Swiss-Prot record:
Ni(2+) binds at H2. One of its GO terms (molecular function) is zinc ion binding. Keywords: Metal-binding, Nickel, Zinc. Belongs to the HypA/HybF family. This is Hydrogenase maturation factor HypA. Zn(2+) binds at C73, C76, C89, C92. It comes from the Bacteria. Involved in the maturation of [NiFe] hydrogenases. Required for nickel insertion into the metal center of the hydrogenase. One of its GO terms (biological process) is protein maturation.
Length: 113
């Protein structure tokens, strides 16, 4: 249930940006979440609504964009899609993969006033 602490961190970022950028209300938050980030989107949405009550982000829409997991295969040099850590390369069968996408958790865009 680390989604609660993630939402608290997101709110902290929103409050800091509000002070530096001068906005007073958040209408929409768009997050990029990698497929390997171990984040449950529905739990994140639930906790976001709870954490933002009474704040500048209360009632804002949380949009989640899932980033597919991709890796680079060291032996064959191919960029491949993976479903989880330690998957084998679909091209050569090697497990020597370096993840290059899918671990993200970042605020991609805000709609504010």
């Amino acid at each position: 249930m680390h989604e609660l602490s993630l939402c608290e961190g997101i709110l902290q970022i929103l409050e800091e940006q509000s002070r530096t950028q001068g906005f007073i209300q958040v209408h929409r938050v768009c997050l990029e979440i990698g497929a390997l980030a171990s984040v449950e989107p529905e739990a994140l949405r639930f906790h976001f609504d709870v954490v933002t009550q009474g704040t500048l982000a209360e009632g804002s829409h949380l949009e989640i964009v899932t980033v597919p997991a991709q890796a680079w295969c060291l032996p064959c040099g191919e960029k491949v899609s993976v479903g989880q850590y330690f998957d084998a390369c679909p091209q050569c069968g090697s497990r020597q993969l370096q993840v290059i996408a899918g671990e993200e958790l970042r605020i991609q865009q805000l709609e504010v006033e």
